[in-house]
Protein backbone atom coordinates (compact mmCIF):
# COMPACT_ATOMS: atom_id res chain seq x y z
CA UNK A 1 0.00 0.00 0.00
CA UNK A 2 2.84 2.40 0.82
CA UNK A 3 4.44 1.80 -2.59
CA UNK A 4 1.09 2.61 -4.26
CA UNK A 5 0.92 5.97 -2.46
CA UNK A 6 4.57 6.68 -3.29
CA UNK A 7 3.91 5.91 -6.96
CA UNK A 8 0.79 8.09 -7.00
CA UNK A 9 2.75 10.88 -5.30
CA UNK A 10 5.50 10.77 -7.95
CA UNK A 11 2.90 10.77 -10.73
CA UNK A 12 1.12 13.74 -9.17
CA UNK A 13 4.40 15.66 -8.88
CA UNK A 14 5.21 14.95 -12.54
CA UNK A 15 1.75 16.13 -13.55
CA UNK A 16 2.11 19.32 -11.53
CA UNK A 17 5.42 20.03 -13.27
CA UNK A 18 4.23 19.27 -16.82
CA UNK A 19 0.74 20.81 -16.62
CA UNK A 20 1.84 24.47 -16.32
CA UNK A 21 4.13 24.01 -19.32
CA UNK A 22 1.29 22.58 -21.41
CA UNK A 23 -1.09 25.34 -20.32
CA UNK A 24 1.55 27.99 -21.03
CA UNK A 25 2.13 26.66 -24.53
CA UNK A 26 -1.56 26.52 -25.33
CA UNK A 27 -2.07 30.09 -24.12
CA UNK A 28 0.99 31.60 -25.85
CA UNK A 29 0.63 29.88 -29.23
CA UNK A 30 -2.40 31.85 -30.45
CA UNK A 31 -0.74 35.12 -29.43
CA UNK A 32 2.41 34.21 -31.29
CA UNK A 33 0.41 33.34 -34.39
CA UNK A 34 -1.62 36.55 -34.16
CA UNK A 35 1.48 38.73 -34.35
CA UNK A 36 2.24 37.41 -37.84
CA UNK A 37 -1.04 38.23 -39.56
CA UNK A 38 -1.09 39.85 -43.02
CA UNK A 39 -1.66 43.33 -41.58
CA UNK A 40 1.45 43.06 -39.42
CA UNK A 41 3.56 41.79 -42.31
CA UNK A 42 2.38 44.49 -44.74
CA UNK A 43 4.40 47.70 -44.84
CA UNK A 44 4.83 50.65 -47.23
CA UNK A 45 7.04 49.72 -50.19
CA UNK A 46 7.76 53.29 -51.25
CA UNK A 47 6.59 56.84 -50.75
CA UNK A 48 3.84 56.50 -53.37
CA UNK A 49 1.48 54.43 -51.22
CA UNK A 50 2.39 51.00 -52.60
CA UNK A 51 2.45 48.17 -50.07
CA UNK A 52 4.57 45.03 -49.78
CA UNK A 53 3.75 41.98 -47.66
CA UNK A 54 6.62 40.00 -46.21
CA UNK A 55 6.35 36.36 -45.21
CA UNK A 56 6.92 35.18 -41.66
CA UNK A 57 9.99 33.32 -42.91
CA UNK A 58 11.41 36.51 -44.46
CA UNK A 59 10.94 38.45 -41.22
CA UNK A 60 12.59 35.68 -39.19
CA UNK A 61 15.58 35.74 -41.58
CA UNK A 62 15.58 39.53 -41.43
CA UNK A 63 15.63 39.42 -37.63
CA UNK A 64 18.87 37.43 -37.77
CA UNK A 65 20.35 39.86 -40.31
CA UNK A 66 19.36 42.83 -38.14
CA UNK A 67 20.78 41.27 -34.98
CA UNK A 68 24.10 40.43 -36.62
CA UNK A 69 24.51 43.67 -38.59
CA UNK A 70 22.53 46.44 -36.88
CA UNK A 71 21.68 45.60 -33.27
CA UNK A 72 25.07 46.61 -31.91
CA UNK A 73 23.99 50.24 -32.35
CA UNK A 74 20.22 49.85 -32.83
CA UNK A 75 19.17 47.23 -30.28
CA UNK A 76 15.38 47.33 -29.81
CA UNK A 77 15.15 50.13 -32.38
CA UNK A 78 17.03 52.65 -30.27
CA UNK A 79 20.01 54.49 -31.77
CA UNK A 80 22.87 54.08 -29.32
CA UNK A 81 24.81 57.11 -30.60
CA UNK A 82 21.79 59.45 -30.75
CA UNK A 83 18.80 58.41 -28.66
CA UNK A 84 16.74 61.26 -30.10
CA UNK A 85 16.55 59.39 -33.42
CA UNK A 86 15.14 55.89 -33.14
CA UNK A 87 13.84 53.33 -35.59
CA UNK A 88 10.21 53.73 -34.53
CA UNK A 89 7.76 54.51 -37.32
CA UNK A 90 7.18 58.11 -36.23
CA UNK A 91 10.90 58.96 -36.23
CA UNK A 92 11.36 57.25 -39.60
CA UNK A 93 8.44 59.16 -41.11
CA UNK A 94 9.82 62.53 -39.96
CA UNK A 95 13.25 61.99 -41.53
CA UNK A 96 14.00 63.73 -44.80
CA UNK A 97 13.54 61.94 -47.05
CA UNK A 98 11.08 59.75 -45.14
CA UNK A 99 12.45 56.35 -44.15
CA UNK A 100 9.14 54.80 -43.11
CA UNK A 101 9.06 52.60 -46.22
CA UNK A 102 11.21 49.81 -47.65
CA UNK A 103 12.68 51.90 -50.49
CA UNK A 104 13.59 54.77 -48.15
CA UNK A 105 15.35 52.50 -45.67
CA UNK A 106 17.20 50.57 -48.38
CA UNK A 107 18.40 53.85 -49.90
CA UNK A 108 19.55 55.02 -46.46
CA UNK A 109 21.45 51.76 -45.87
CA UNK A 110 23.18 52.20 -49.22
CA UNK A 111 23.87 55.93 -48.81
CA UNK A 112 23.41 57.07 -45.19
CA UNK A 113 22.30 60.70 -44.91
CA UNK A 114 21.71 62.95 -41.91
CA UNK A 115 18.22 62.92 -40.41
CA UNK A 116 17.39 66.14 -42.25
CA UNK A 117 18.85 64.77 -45.51
CA UNK A 118 21.33 67.64 -45.80
CA UNK A 119 24.61 65.71 -45.88
CA UNK A 120 26.15 62.25 -46.09
CA UNK A 121 27.01 60.46 -42.85
CA UNK A 122 28.77 57.57 -44.61
CA UNK A 123 31.95 58.36 -42.67
CA UNK A 124 30.24 57.77 -39.33
CA UNK A 125 27.28 55.47 -40.07
CA UNK A 126 27.68 51.96 -41.48
CA UNK A 127 26.32 51.49 -44.95
CA UNK A 128 27.12 49.87 -48.25
CA UNK A 129 29.06 53.00 -49.27
CA UNK A 130 30.82 53.50 -45.92
CA UNK A 131 34.57 53.41 -46.01
CA UNK A 132 35.97 52.04 -42.76
CA UNK A 133 32.94 52.04 -40.48
CA UNK A 134 31.64 48.53 -39.79
CA UNK A 135 32.82 47.08 -43.10
CA UNK A 136 30.62 44.01 -42.54
CA UNK A 137 27.70 46.05 -43.92
CA UNK A 138 29.36 46.07 -47.34
CA UNK A 139 28.73 42.32 -47.64
CA UNK A 140 24.94 42.77 -47.62
CA UNK A 141 23.15 42.55 -50.96
CA UNK A 142 19.95 44.31 -52.06
CA UNK A 143 17.76 41.43 -50.87
CA UNK A 144 19.41 41.51 -47.42
CA UNK A 145 18.77 45.26 -47.22
CA UNK A 146 15.14 44.77 -48.29
CA UNK A 147 14.66 42.16 -45.57
CA UNK A 148 16.28 44.34 -42.89
CA UNK A 149 14.00 47.22 -43.92
CA UNK A 150 10.98 44.91 -43.64
CA UNK A 151 12.06 43.80 -40.18
CA UNK A 152 12.50 47.39 -38.98
CA UNK A 153 9.07 48.38 -40.32
CA UNK A 154 7.27 45.38 -38.77
CA UNK A 155 9.11 45.42 -35.42
CA UNK A 156 7.05 48.20 -33.85
CA UNK A 157 3.82 46.45 -34.87
CA UNK A 158 4.95 43.34 -33.00
CA UNK A 159 6.82 44.88 -30.05
CA UNK A 160 4.77 48.03 -29.56
CA UNK A 161 6.36 50.90 -27.64
CA UNK A 162 9.30 48.73 -26.67
CA UNK A 163 10.62 49.13 -30.23
CA UNK A 164 12.37 52.47 -30.46
CA UNK A 165 10.92 53.54 -27.13
CA UNK A 166 14.21 54.16 -25.39
CA UNK A 167 15.62 53.00 -22.11
CA UNK A 168 12.39 53.42 -20.13
CA UNK A 169 11.34 50.06 -21.61
CA UNK A 170 14.52 48.13 -20.80
From Swiss-Prot:
Topological category with respect to the lipid bilayer: Peripheral membrane protein
Primary location group: membrane
Keywords associated with the record: Electron transport, Heme, Iron, Membrane, Metal-binding, Photosynthesis, Photosystem II, Signal, Thylakoid, Transport
Keyword Transport: yes
A single GO cellular-component term on record: plasma membrane-derived thylakoid membrane
GO MF term list: electron transfer activity; heme binding; iron ion binding
Alphabetized InterPro entries for the sequence: Cyt_c-like_dom, Cyt_c-like_dom_sf, Cytochrom_C550, PsbV_cyt_c550, PsbV_cyt_c550-like
A Pfam family it matches: Cytochrom_C550
Gene Ontology biological process: photosynthesis, light reaction; respiratory electron transport chain
Signal peptide (from-to): 1-33
Essential cofactor(s): heme c
Source superkingdom: Bacteria
Cofactor, how bound (note): Binds 1 heme c group covalently per subunit.
Compartments it resides in: Cellular thylakoid membrane
Residues given in the record as heme c binding sites: 70, 73-74, 125
Self-association and partners: PSII is composed of 1 copy each of membrane proteins PsbA, PsbB, PsbC, PsbD, PsbE, PsbF, PsbH, PsbI, PsbJ, PsbK, PsbL, PsbM, PsbT, PsbX, PsbY, Psb30/Ycf12, peripheral proteins PsbO, CyanoQ (PsbQ), PsbU, PsbV and a large number of cofactors. It forms dimeric complexes.
Function: One of the extrinsic, lumenal subunits of photosystem II (PSII). PSII is a light-driven water plastoquinone oxidoreductase, using light energy to abstract electrons from H(2)O, generating a proton gradient subsequently used for ATP formation. The extrinsic proteins stabilize the structure of photosystem II oxygen-evolving complex (OEC), the ion environment of oxygen evolution and protect the OEC against heat-induced inactivation. Low-potential cytochrome c that plays a role in the OEC of PSII.
Similarity comment: Belongs to the cytochrome c family. PsbV subfamily.
Name of the protein in question: Photosystem II extrinsic protein V
Organism: Prochlorococcus marinus (strain MIT 9313)
Lineage: Bacteria, Bacillati, Cyanobacteriota, Cyanophyceae, Synechococcales
Gene name, Swiss-Prot/TrEMBL: psbV
Amino acid sequence: MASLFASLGRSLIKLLIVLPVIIGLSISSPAMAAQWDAETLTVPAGSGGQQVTFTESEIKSASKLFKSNCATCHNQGVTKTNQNVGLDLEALSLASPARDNVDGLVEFLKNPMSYDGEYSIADTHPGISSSDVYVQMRTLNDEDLRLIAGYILTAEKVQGDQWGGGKIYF
